[in-house]
UniProtKB/Swiss-Prot annotation:
Keyword tags: ATP-binding, Chromatin regulator, Chromosome, Citrullination, DNA damage, DNA repair, DNA-binding, Helicase, Hydrolase, Isopeptide bond, Nucleotide-binding, Nucleus, Phosphoprotein, Telomere, Transcription, Transcription regulation, Ubl conjugation
Catalytic activity: ATP + H2O = ADP + phosphate + H(+)
Molecular functions per Gene Ontology: ATP binding; ATP hydrolysis activity; chromatin binding; chromo shadow domain binding; DNA binding; DNA translocase activity; helicase activity; histone binding
Phosphoserine modifications at: 62, 74, 112-114, 162, 345-346, 354, 423, 425, 427, 449, 453
Domain of life: Eukaryota
Family recorded in the similarity comment: Belongs to the SNF2/RAD54 helicase family.
Organism whose genome encodes this protein: Rattus norvegicus
This protein's name: Transcriptional regulator ATRX
Biased composition (Acidic residues): 387-398
Length: 527
């Protein structure tokens, strides 16, 4: 009698501990002995209904975590109950061997249930739960038969859907991916529920009313079967839709690839055409630029050539004018030394003295009468040359030059400015050349026995000429300087030609040329 009372107290305490754990912990094996198999059925059906309700809101991660937590809680609760039972047995100290054996068996059962495998107890428990096991087996057989029927129907529906695949429109890849994810999530949830149902079924508290439990079990079975059928239909539809979408996507991708390839070819052609156009445009621009540059160069060459021609014309005009200036004094300078030389060779000193006197008179006066007098003198010279045919052969080219000089002077009788320049150049050349054609004794200031007074007369007009020449040089411009330089050069050439005729006086003439060059340089420095 004591053992029965103690056992009842332990059962009450264990029920209180199960209530505190919010119904998530597993009951002890003793409670299973007390209650009927109908209570177990009710608890299983309630667990299934609650699990189906909360199915849609759960996720994979939450399910996994909940399972681990529940297993840990169940293991902890079982260990706590074991400890409490051991303490109570230790305090009371009076228990029968039968109770000890039952405790050992029940501990083994708890361990097997924590691992997810349910094992029926031996002895009396087998007789108590045999009826519930048979009923569970019958329920499972009925559900299996219904599942087979639904499978046959689903196969027929799949065939019909495969026929209607071609008619349906194309769905995007995004829809396919979303549907595939949903189907996978649902399949995983179902599998997890199937594993979790047997573990949770044992953790619920039993209810006393047997009639209510039977009704709820029947309604839940019907609901579960209907839901299963709907789920199977949804799976088949989604799988068929995914197959269609994949086929259509492949066909669409092939068509889009063909279109894309055609578009790419068109784009490449356009790019090539544009590149060709650009190249042609650049070539045309280069050609135009080359043409423009060539035309500009030609124009520049033409302008430069025209300017060069103008400069050449100006230079040629200036050279012609300078040539004219050169020619006139040269020819006139050649005349006077030839007269003097011829007069000295013939021995007519009076005629040689009269020629420079007339030239000085011409320098003083610029009237046409002086010009006429010059012409008369030239004619007289020609007559003297024709009369004196016994002269040396060296004098013959000089006579031709004299004729040319006479013609030029007759052709240009009215040029006043040229006569002025000629008169200046004549005076300069006379200064440089008269001492050359003196007698040797006169250069050394030695006079002839008959003509000392004549030498004095010559020196006076020479001094008078030098003063006049200096005054004219101060007034004259740079052009006269050039003419003086040219005249000095001409006089040097004439002196060289005369040196060939007169080898006796070469040393004296060289000394005079050096003196003349020195005097010319000094004059330039003064200016």
């Amino acid at each position: 009698g004591r053992s029965v009372v103690e056992f009842g107290d332990m059962v009450c305490k264990r029920q209180q501990s199960a209530v505190s754990s919010a119904g998530s912990e597993k009951p002890s094996g003793k409670e299973e002995n007390v209650h009927s198999p109908e209570d177990k059925r009710v608890t299983k059906s309630k667990e299934k209904s609650k699990h189906l309700r909360t199915r849609t809101g759960r996720k994979v991660k939450s399910d996994v975590t909940d399972r681990f937590r529940k297993k840990e809680q169940s293991s902890e609760s079982s260990e706590g109950e074991k400890k409490q039972g051991r303490q109570r047995t230790g305090t009371r100290g009076k228990k029968s061997t039968d109770l000890k054996e039952e405790k050992v068996k029940r501990e083994r059962e708890y361990e097997s249930s924590s691992d997810g495998t349910e094992k029926l107890p031996e002895g009396e428990e087998i007789g108590l739960f045999s009826k519930g096991v048979k009923q569970n087996k019958n329920d499972t057989t009925d559900e299996a038969k219904k599942g087979k029927k639904w499978k046959d129907k689903s196969c027929e529906k799949k065939e019909e859907l495969s026929d209607s695949v071609d008619r349906l429109p194309v769905k995007g890849e995004s829809c396919d991916s979303s549907e595939d994810k949903k189907t996978r999530n649902r399949v995983s949830l179902r599998e997890k529920k199937q594993f979790s149902l047997p573990a949770k079924s044992s953790g619920k508290r039993p209810e006393c009313s047997s009639s209510d439990t039977e009704r709820s079990v029947k309604g839940e079975c019907c609901d579960s079967t209907d839901k299963r059928v709907k789920r199977i239909d949804l799976r088949e539809r989604r799988s068929s839709n995914s197959k269609r979408s994949t086929k259509e996507v492949k066909s669409g991708s092939s068509s889009s690839d063909a279109e894309g390839s055609s578009e790419d070819a068109k784009k490449q052609k356009k790019q090539r055409m544009s590149a060709k156009k650009k190249n042609s445009n650049t070539k045309e621009r280069k050609r135009k630029s080359l043409r423009a540059t060539t035309t500009k160069r030609k124009q520049a060459d033409i302008t430069s050539s025209s300017s060069d021609i103008g400069d050449d014309d100006q230079n040629s005009a200036g050279e012609e004018s300078s040539d004219e200036q050169k020619i006139k004094p040269v020819t006139e300078n050649l005349v006077l030394p030839s007269h003097t030389g011829f007069c000295q060779s013939s021995g007519d000193e009076a005629f040689s003295k009269s020629v420079p006197a007339t030239v000085d008179d011409d320098d003083d006066d610029n009237d046409p009468e002086n010009r006429i007098a010059k012409k008369m003198l030239l004619e007289e010279i020609k007559a003297n040359l024709s009369s004196d045919e016994d002269g040396s052969s060296d004098d013959e080219p000089k006579e031709g030059e004299k004729k040319r000089i006479g013609k030029q002077s007759e052709e240009t009788p009215g040029d006043d400015g040229s006569n002025q320049v000629n008169s200046e150049s004549d005076s300069d050349s006379e200064e440089s050349k008269k001492p050359r054609y003196r007698h040797r004794l006169l250069r050394h200031k030695l006079s002839l026995s008959d003509g000392e007074s004549g030498g004095e007369k010559k020196t006076k007009p020479k001094e008078h000429k030098e003063t006049k020449g200096r005054n004219r040089r101060k007034v004259s411009s740079e052009d006269s300087e050039d003419t003086d330089f040219q005249e000095s050069g001409v006089s040097e050439e004439v002196s060289e030609s005369e040196d060939e005729q007169r080898p006796r006086t070469r040393s004296a003439k060289k000394a005079e040329l050096e003196e003349n060059q020195r005097s010319y340089k000094q004059k330039k420095k003064r200016r």
